[in-house]
Regions:
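Core catalytic region of metal-dependent phosphoesterases/phosphodiesterases
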Residues: 1-61
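Short, electropositive alpha-helical surface patch
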Residues: 37-55, 136-144, 199-205
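Active-site glycine-rich loop that binds ribose-phosphate moieties when present
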Residues: 51, 55-56, 63-67, 96-109
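Short acidic-hydrophobic surface loop/beta-edge motif
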Residues: 66-75, 132-133
């Protein structure tokens, strides 16, 4: 659906369902999504965070456009850069992720970034991709929304079919990382799928009904 209140309700219900399945979760973080999911002055993510916290009584924080997060365990540390927004690569989407990774390395080497990320997490392109280079793991998240037939999406119809699901990232006692994606089968929109049953055939030189 492209109806914003329905999208907010669905996202809230999905997060709450996951929290009930994993009751040990102590905090939830939500980042800003694409602008067409937003209302001016009231980001959808901020509203979702408020609803989740009210419903589940668990600390839920709206993080805005991006965040740097540092994980620490004993003598080990991992730094994550997280943002919904991502550069595109329609035909070869892996190349966009690789360029992003190289851009972080270049900016860090030129001292334009004070931190070298260990993990880069992005979304927006609606498909799961995982790349590991130069001791950096780059993860592009799948989507929770089925195909939306707006003009640009229809032009790139075979390329913009989304992966529906999520990613669970596991860290061991040394903060070594494993990204475990889970996806669900896509579906055909029943309103756009027309099944024609053959009722006519050619008999001799005449078109006759079979």
């Amino acid at each position: 659906t492209t109806d914003l209140p329905t999208q907010i309700q669905i996202a809230t219900d999905l997060i709450c369902k996951f929290l009930r399945m994993v009751p040990t979760i102590q905090e939830v973080y939500i980042w800003k999504g694409t602008d067409y999911h937003e209302i001016y002055g009231l980001p959808a993510g901020e509203y979702i965070a408020t609803k989740v916290q009210e419903k589940m009584k668990i600390s839920t924080k709206y993080m805005g456009n991006y965040s740097w997060i540092e994980l620490q365990y004993k003598d080990h540390s991992k730094k994550l850069f997280i943002s919904h927004h991502a550069s595109g690569g329609t035909v070869y989407p892996e190349s966009a992720i690789a360029r992003d990774l190289q851009g972080f390395l270049k900016a860090w080497g030129a001292e334009r970034l004070p931190i070298k990320p260990d993990i880069i997490v992005r979304a927006h392109n609606h498909s799961f991709i995982g790349i590991h280079e130069h001791n950096i793991r780059a993860i592009q998240l799948p989507c929770w929304q089925f195909f939306v037939p707006y003009d640009n999406a229809m032009k790139r119809y075979p390329y913009w079919q989304p992966d529906i699901g999520g990613v669970i990232t596991l860290f061991d006692h040394k903060l070594r990382t494993t990204a475990w994606p889970f996806t669900y089968p896509n579906i055909i929109d029943p309103q756009s799928y027309l099944k024609l049953t053959k009722i006519y055939g050619v008999t001799g030189k005449r078109l006759g009904k079979k």
